[in-house]
Structures are given as C-alpha cells and as structure tokens.
Amino acid sequence: MKGYQFEDTQGTFHLKKAENISYLYFPIAGEAGLKSSFTPNLGGDAKIDQNTFLLEPVSAENLVNNRNSRNFWCNVKGIGSWSLTGHSAEELSKKFTEMQDDSEVTAGFMWQKTTRESKKYQLRGEILSFIPVDKNVEIMLVTITNTGRMAQTVTPTAAIPLYGRSADNIRDHRHVTSLLHRIETTDTGVLVTPTLSFDERGHQVNHMTYYCVGWSGNGEKPVDFYPTAEDFVGEGGNFERPYAIVKNAEGVKAGTKIEGLEAVGGLHFSEITLEPEEECSYLIFTGITEDIQEIRNLSKTYTTREKVLEELEKTKAYWQEKVNVAYHTGDSDFNQFMHWVSFQPILRRIYGCSFLPHHDYGKGGRGWRDLWQDCLALLIMNPDGVRQMLLDNFAGVRIDGSNATIIGSKQGEFVADRNNITRVWMDHGVWPMITTKFYIDQTGDLELLEKEAAYFKDKQIARGTRTDTLWDESYGCWQKTKRGVREEGTILEHLLLQNLTAFYEVGEHNNIRLRGADWNDALDMACEKGESVAFSNAYAGNLADIAELLEAYQKKTGKETVSLLAEIVILLEDNPALYDSVEKKLHVLEEYLHTCEHDTSGEKVEISIEKLTENLRHKSEWLMEHIRKNEWVKDSEENGWFNGYYDNHGRQVEGDTKTGVRMMLTGQVFSIMAGTATEEQIRQITKSADRYLYDEKVGGYRLNTDFGEVKTDLGRMFGFS
C-alpha cells in the first residue's frame, strides 16, 4: 500500500481515496471488551466475543462485498440521497471515474476520521469514529457542511444494521435467531434485546441489549425511526439503495415494539437548512450492554459535540501512553512506522487471532504462546507487573512438562481440558525459557528462579498420551502431593521439567517428536512419526541458557545447591550412551511420567548447581552435535542447510530430492539462534536461503520452497498457496 502520509510524531496518518484500496480496514477497540474493525466506507464489524456480535461478522471477502455496513445518509431536497460513507449504489457506480467523491481517511491509535466531499450535492461529510477506553460503545461524530453557494435543505439519517447474536448464527439458524429479536424504539434510538442466545453453549437466556442511539450536536432527538431491515430497505431495495432514504419515508415513533425481524439502527432526524459554509453535527452511539441505564447515561455524558471531542482526547492520550517507546533515525516515516509496530502487541492482546477480518482463526481467547508474547511486549513498554505475570503464567505448566491449553480470562487462570486425548504442541516448552531469559537479561532479577509457582492439573497425563482416571473436578486444577497438599516448585524447576521432558521425548531419529505440531500449527499431520529438528535446536539452546543462568545465579547468591522435585532426578541421568539410544531415552521419560501420574511424592532434594549446570550443558552439546552430524543436507552444487523435519513416514523432509530441492526456513533460524550452526554453516545456510527462499516479489524470504504436493504426512500447510 502506498500513498499514506504521517502528520505528526504519534503515528497519525492520512490516506486519500482509501476506499480504492481493497481489503483495507482499521482496528478500533477499548479495554471494556468491544473490538471493532472499520473500513474507509465504515464497513467491518463489532463484537465483544464469539457469541456477542453487535454488527454482522465479516471476513476479508465481506469487506469488499457486504452491503449492510455502518452508514449515514443525507436526503438532499430536490437533488437526491448522498451517503457520507460512500456506501451507496450511486457512489459505487462512479468509482474509478472523475465523478467519484473526493475522500480521505485520517487515523491514529484506536480512532479514525473519514472525510468525503461531493461535487454533485455540494456537501462535505466528516465521520469521526472511536471507542471510549472504559465503555462498550462505538461513537460516531458526524459533521455535515454546505460547501455550495446556496442554502441546502437536507434530512440526515443514521443507518446501522444491528446483528445482535453469535457469529455461529451467520449461517446456522440465521433466520430462526432473528425470530428471537425484541426490538424497541426509545426517544433516542433503537434497542434490540434477543430473548435467547443460540450458540455452541446451547440455548441460553440472553441478557445483552444491542443498540444504536443518537442526537444532534445541539441535543435534538430523532423525529422517528427505521428499526427493521425490511422497512428500511423496502420491497426490492437494499442497503445501498434503501427505500426509506430515497423516499425520505416516515418512520415509526418512539415507543414502538417489534418482534422477530432483522434490526437496523435507523435514526431519522428532522429536516435542516444549511447556509453556505454552515455545518451541523450528529452524535451516534452503537453498542452492547447488560444494563439499560448505561444507554440512558450516554445522553447525560455526551450532550454536545465538545463532550465527545473531550472523550476522544482522553482516548488518544490513553493509547499513546501505552506506547512509551520512541524511535529516532534519519527517516521520519520509519520512526512513525515503528510507532505502529510498537502498538501491534497491544492490538494482538485485544484482538487475539480471531477478531479481525484477516485474523479469523478460532473463536477468541488466548493461547499458551500468547501469554509469553504479552510478557515480552510489556517488558519493553510497561515492565511493572511483568514479574507477577511470569509467576502466574508458570502455574499453567503440568508436572509432566506439558501445559494447559485452555487459558482463562483472568491472569493465572487455566481451565481443565476434558477431552480424552488432548493435542500437544511440542514447541510450548520453549517459550517460557526464552521469555524468562529476556526478563532476567533486562532486569538482572536472577532471584526469580527461586520463586515458587503451582503446577496445573487436569485429567491429561503423560504429556497428553493418557488420562488420569483418578482425577475429577473435585480434585481441582492444581497438582497435589500424596499428602493432599498443593505441589509448588521453583521457576527453575518448572523450566527444567519443560525442557528435560522434551529432551527425552524423541522419535526414531533421536530428535524431539513433532506431536500435534510445533509453532507452525499447520504441521499437524505427523503426530506418530514426525520429528521437529527445528525446535530440537531451540530446546538445545534452552538447556544451554538455563545452565548459563544457573552459573550467574550461583555467582550472585553464593548458593551451592538448589531444591528440586525428588522425581526430577530420573531426568538428570548424564550418560552419552543413554543419549544415543532412542529406546533408553523413552524408557527414562516413561519412568518419570509414571512417578507423577496422579500425585507427586511431595519430596524435595538438594542438587549441586555445579553438577546441574554441567549436566544441562552435556545434554545441550549432545543434541547440537547430533543435529550437526545427522541433519546437514546439501544440493548437487554443495549448497548446505539443516533439515528441519521428519514426516509421518519417518522420512527426512528437506534436501535435494527427486522432485526438486526442498528447504524450510524455520530449521535454519533456530539452528543459528541456538548456536547449533557453526560459522561456516551459517555462511552456507545464508547462501542457500538466498538461492531457494528469497523472493524479491514478496520482499523477503519464503517459509519454504514449493514442495509440489499436498504433503498429508506432514501437515495441512502444503495445501495452502
């Protein structure tokens, strides 16, 4: 995308005719839960969670093709009907011609302003959109200006379709769930309170009200309303050419109640005459609440345009304060771009993987990796509280080295997985150590290693391969000892269990098993024989890093030993002959897992820091040397790189094959980061990556070469383009 220009040092930018760029949208959210997407034409959606969508859910394709978006119309007496968003049949017919309206989008952190000017209608419209930090409501401040030389008489109407239910109902029971709608008009707008909510949780009594209310800048209320889609668009009409707008039709009055129809927040204001250069404004509020009083309070809080602008400034200041990192280079555009890069982790925390049009993976919530990524971002921009966040996150580790995969809404809250056999991502044990090391490197807080945290417990045991038949919900979600006391261990102990259990869980080539996938979720079809050499590198690097932290801890504290779970001694056998044997390593792992299937002994042992450090280094060095010796591949021209994976037939994935060269980026990155790759190997990897993965058209390196097949013995990623 080209053409945007930064306006200040806080990332504010503007872009002319932004609607001519396909799939463009902007995130606007608050901290109370409402999260929205806005296109330049005010398309997009708004929701609190998967089951609570204010506006109809959209994917990337819907951004271009949906008709029912947020809109604000002016019926101009004697001329026609003009959409301030550009979302009208008339304006769309002018697209890519000289008759197209002049338009511009200006935006900053969590706010957007669209400006549109029509030669035909001699009007300029400005729509400022944002969400207050502490409220679940979108605020639109609409300003209409007469740019002509003569007085203009216009009738303004806000028109926002209210979806008001779960995203599941976009196809499943779409019509049936509209029958649940109970629509009511008040003196300021339209309220929709469905009787029930239909979603994967079953049929539940609904307590949410979805609404659109508004008034003019001087407090004038709408004269009437268009509360249903069928009355608004009319017979044969649609949201781009609605009957009610074209005919300036009379709506229903306040106090009207309607059941069982699709709803629209249609607010029909009184006719107003604007002299040349005169302007008028309207305040539109679209939101979700469980308390009707919150809607009434809006008319008391935001009585004027000035009150809305005051709220906007508070909102801007709040989000700018979150990004307290500044960049100073010779390129001012790069500095401002990096301001947005710094804001991205905040957007990721709010939206997750599920709630933006191009990020529609799953149904919301955060995953295990997200917990640690949040810590990394906060360490740079808001370090207060990171220590406690780390401690709380470690409580999601199971005693078998795996971890909870269902994350609660509160910090340190984890939910039991009730599936018989759960999916295990083999990379999950990597990230806590990487985050902890970064935290200690930044703060020098080596004492964190001796702080204690609980262990998560549910019926999943033996790293997701068996279930604990003795566990039920009365046991609770915290690991206990045989004495019924909650088991707690140091952060060091948690790190050791995650990385040591992974070290022993190997496939037939003595690399760590791929299991359900690694950080590439799409490598998900090799759970029996798949191995991730890429993340074996990462674990090898972690073992070396733990040893380094232990040395620094000993030097700082003067302590000679650390207290660890007695059962962990099984995993601390230090014998090259053991490391060379897949069978013996799996036996050690099984022996350990058997000792803590239900409860732990509750016993602790003192381990020499010096011996533990030596032990970890031996394991790390063995694993790195094993990879150097067995996983280095070459093409016919002697270009070399590391194989990163084994498929579900136990075959090496990368190399110079009969169907061509196969190379993946992940294994190269982690072999270099961990220290597995020698200086000479790094040079060869770089040369090979430049040869096989670099693509100037995409501006960088691809994740892999084209394998030329849908490789169903490794993962669904090979079905993607």
Where are the model-predicted features located?
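Conserved H-X4-D acyltransferase segment
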Residues: 367-381, 667-678
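A terminal-accessory region detector
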Residues: 636, 643-645, 659-663, 674
